[in-house]
Amino acid sequence: MLAGVRICVVYDCLFPYTVGGGERWYRNLSERLAAEGHEVTYLTLRQWGRGERPDLDPRIRVITVGPRMGLYTASGRRRILPPLVFGLGVFLHLLRRGRRYEVVHTCAFPYFSLLAAALLQPLRRYDVAVDWFEVWSDSYWRDYLGGIGGLIGSLVQRLCARVPQRAHCFSMLHAERLRAEGLRGTVTLLRGLYAAPMESPTPRAADPVVLFAGRLIPEKQVTLAVAAVALAAERIEGLGGVFLGDGPEHTALDAAIAEHGLEDVVSAPGFASAERVDAEMRRALCMLLTSRREGYGMVVVEAAARATPSVVVAGEDNAATELLEEGVNGEIAATSDPRAIADAIIRVHEGGLAMRVSTGRWFSEHARELSLESSLETVLAGYASARA
């Protein structure tokens, strides 16, 4: 076993102070690396009170390189200033302390910290490992930041793709895009992010409930999910819905529930505990993921771990479809039309217990590659190569 690697993990957020797939990945990665005897430093922005110690394995050295800052606008988009501040903080830290590290492991987005690490790499002689959860298309950049801003964003992304690095992607979609952006070298595909126990799930009969779980931002298209549930409820007696999560689209969610007259059968309680999410996943007819943009689609794996199928909407920026085998662990709606999504929900309903059995079997067959441990082993192999 490779031991004693000095690793600097770089991410501007830390779970559970902010919640998301990237936050979970870097916390899990850091804690597993520390548990295996590696020397881990975690660079981040401060997200807790002054003088407090963050809730993290004490073997991990947490260094804040920037102050506490709001990361998102009211509409749910990333603010520009925090990534700039974080990038500068990372640059200054690595300028002073970079020689102590053998590997700097960073997320590609929001880019400036990666550029800082890449700029100092020739001087400080560490290896740079980069996780690309997503590679945005030019059209998505324009939608997100407008014409000029989108052009600048796409150019910065292209620059980041071309710096020397050991690149990791979590889907074929984004691996192919990264190569197209001009990456020099190979892309390592990491398929496993699931950190919970990998026991084979025991299927149970579903309740007539569609579950939505995620941050309520425009990309998740939560009002589209409500419309689809309303249409499916016309054909499935007693069908309801549970929408777990919070965010800037919560007001729109409540309005959509009222507009479709679903107040008695659809609930939207906001942020939920892990225990509540687990219970809802186990009983749900399906997990509904109407997102138009996903770098991975973790909720599909989490649902399958409980023998619950998923319904996912196809789209050019949605990598979650890679986790779906239609008719086995869920269904794919070909378009973002509410009727197409409702039809997919109906197909899951018609699949009955047999589809829940096949979903559990799918999870068991893919458990090894879907596990965090499999990705960790791949990452460690890359570290060993860097040390050699």
What spans do the regions from the language model cover?
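Membrane-proximal helix-turn-helix segments that form the acceptor-binding/catalytic region
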Residues: 95, 115, 119-123, 130, ...
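Short beta-strand->alpha-helix junction loop in the catalytic core
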Residues: 136, 173-174, 181-183, 190-200, ...
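Conserved donor-binding/catalytic core segment of Leloir-type glycosyltransferases
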Residues: 168, 202-229
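Nucleotide-activated donor-binding/catalytic signature segment of Leloir-type glycosyltransferases, i.e.
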Residues: 254-272
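Short alpha-helical donor nucleotide-sugar binding micro-motif in glycosyltransferases
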Residues: 271-272, 279-284
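Aromatic "clamp/platform" in nucleotide-sugar-dependent glycosyltransferases that forms part
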Residues: 292
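Conserved acidic donor-binding segment of nucleotide-sugar-dependent glycosyltransferases
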Residues: 325-338, 346-353
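A charged, aromatic-enriched C-terminal amphipathic alpha-helix characteristic of glycosyltransferases
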Residues: 352-384
